[in-house]
Amino acid sequence: MTFIEGKTEKWEYVIGLEIHAQIKSNAKLFSSASTEFGSSPNSQVELLDAAMPGSLPVLNEFCVHQAIKTALGINAKINKLSIFDRKNYFYADLPAGYQISQFYHPIAQGGWIEILDENGNIKRIQINRLHIEQDTGKSTHDQSDTYSYIDLNRSGIALMEIVSEPDISSPMQAAEYIKKLRAILRYLDSCNGDMEKGSLRCDANISVRKPNSELGTKCEIKNLNSIKSIVRALEFEGQRQVNILESGGTVKQESLLFDATLGKTFPMRSKENATDYRYFPDPDLPPIILDQSLIDNIASSLPELPDAKIRRYINEIKLSDYNAQVLAADKDISCFFEEVIKTANPLLSANWILSELFGLMNKDGITINECKITANHFSELIQLISSKAISSKIAKTVLKEMFDSGKSPKIIMQEKNIQQISDPNQIADIIDDVLKDNYQSVVSYRNGKDRLFGFFVGQVMKKTAGNANPALINEILHTKLKQFQI
C-alpha cells in the first residue's frame, strides 16, 4: 500500500475504477452502422444513431456473446436474465436524450482480477458488475469560435462497463489493474484495448481516509485515456483532498476532469446520483434471456488467459517469474514467443526476446506486429546460437540486420560473409601467434596474474574480427598457456 504524506499524518487512497471497453464488433449495439475507427465525421450513422423518430433498436447478438466471454474471463457470474434501461440526461452528443444501459439487471455481477502490488504480492481486486451500454457521440469545441461540432459516428457503439469495488489502494495498483484487464480483453478478442483510439476509457472514483477510518467523500475523474494520465490524476487528486481535509475543509462530491498539460484536476459538475438519471426499463427492448447451454458453449471456447499462461511458463518451461509475466502480458508477444519455441530453446529464446529484441523495438518505438523479424527467422537465430554455430557477438550483429531488413539470419550471414571460426586447428594457430606476440604478458600470467587471460581472449577475437568460437578459444587458450615454453 502507498500512503499519501500529509502535513500531520499519513492518508490512504481508496480507489475504484469504471472501465468503458468498446466491444470488438463490426456493427453497433442496436444498429448495423459500421464501427470502423477514423472515418469522416457522421459517415457511419443510421437513423437510430441520430434518434430519428420511429427508429427502433435491434440488439446485436454478437455483442452479447462478447460480453459473456468477457464476464467469464474476469470470473464474473452471468445473469441469465438482464434488462436494458434508459439513463436519462441531456447532452448535445446524445441525440435521444437518454443512453441505453443496464442499471437494475446487468448481464454479469461479481468477479475478480489478480494483480501484483508494490511489494510483488498477489492482490485480488473484486469486480462489482459488468453491463452493456451504448456509447455517445463526440463533441468538438475547438474548430470554431461560434459553434460546437457533433460527430455521431461513435453514437450507439457497444460498450462494456466494468466496475471494480474500491479495493485499489494506490495509483500504481490502478495502473496494474488496467494493464491486466486490458491484457485479458485482448486475449479474449472482445476489445482491442487501444486507449489512444478511445476503445478503452477510464473513470476513476477516489477518496482518502486515515488508516482504519470510515470512507471519505469520493470524487470521480472522468474520461482518462492513458495509463500515465490515470496515475498522474490519482496522485494529484489524492494530495488535493488531503490538503483540503488537513486545512479543515470538506471535500465536495463532484465530477472532475484532468488537465494533462497542467497535471491538475478541475471541476466538471457536481456528481450525480442514480436518481438524477431517472432509470427505467427500455420499452423498445425485450429482456435478454440466456440459456446455460450458450454460456457453457462460450466458456468452452475461451483461450488460455494471462494468469494461466504465466503459470505454464513458470512450471513447464521453467521461466523466471519476471520473464513469464512480461512475455504473457501481451497477447502478440506471447504468440511470437510460442511460435519461436516450437523449434528453439525456450529459456534462450526468452532471454533474447526480452533483452536484445525488446531493446531494438523500444529504440524504434514499435510493437512486435510492426517488427520485420518473423518468429521462424528468430527461431533460426536462436538455433544457431544454441548449436554454437555463431557467438553471441555475431548473433547481435545478425539480429540488428534482421531487424532492419527482415531477412533470415542465414541469408544475412551469406551476404555479409559472416562465419564463425570453429576449426580447432585454425584457432590454435591464431592463439600461438598471440602468445608469441605477447611473451611478457604470458610470463606475467604464469607468475599469477590470472586477469591477463581476458586480455589474451581479446587479442584472439581481435585477430579474427570477433568471429572465433568463444568456447573453443577458452578451452584451447587454457591448454596453450600451460604448455607455453618460457
Curated annotation (Swiss-Prot):
Its EC number is 6.3.5.-. Transmembrane segments: none annotated. It catalyses: L-glutamyl-tRNA(Gln) + L-glutamine + ATP + H2O = L-glutaminyl-tRNA(Gln) + L-glutamate + ADP + phosphate + H(+); L-aspartyl-tRNA(Asn) + L-glutamine + ATP + H2O = L-asparaginyl-tRNA(Asn) + L-glutamate + ADP + phosphate + 2 H(+). SMART domains: GatB_Yqey. Signal peptide: none annotated. One of its GO terms (molecular function) is ATP binding. InterPro entries: Asn/Gln-tRNA_amidoTrfase_suB/E, Asn/Gln-tRNA_Trfase_suB/E_cat, Asn/Gln_amidotransferase, Asn/Gln_tRNA_amidoTrase-B-like, GatB, GatB_C_1, GatB_Yqey_C_2, Gln-tRNA_amidoTrfase_suB_CS. It is an enzyme of class 6 (ligase). GO terms for biological process: glutaminyl-tRNAGln biosynthesis via transamidation; translation. SUPFAM superfamilies: GatB/YqeY motif (SSF89095), Glutamine synthetase/guanido kinase (SSF55931). Keywords: ATP-binding, Ligase, Nucleotide-binding, Protein biosynthesis. GO terms for cellular component: glutamyl-tRNA(Gln) amidotransferase complex. Pfam families: GatB_N (PF02934), GatB_Yqey (PF02637). The keyword Nucleotide-binding applies. It comes from the Bacteria. Heterotrimer of A, B and C subunits. Allows the formation of correctly charged Asn-tRNA(Asn) or Gln-tRNA(Gln) through the transamidation of misacylated Asp-tRNA(Asn) or Glu-tRNA(Gln) in organisms which lack either or both of asparaginyl-tRNA or glutaminyl-tRNA synthetases. The reaction takes place in the presence of glutamine and ATP through an activated phospho-Asp-tRNA(Asn) or phospho-Glu-tRNA(Gln). Belongs to the GatB/GatE family. GatB subfamily. HAMAP family: GatB. This is Aspartyl/glutamyl-tRNA(Asn/Gln) amidotransferase subunit B. It comes from Orientia tsutsugamushi (strain Ikeda). The lineage of its organism: Bacteria, Pseudomonadati, Pseudomonadota, Alphaproteobacteria, Rickettsiales. The gene is gatB.
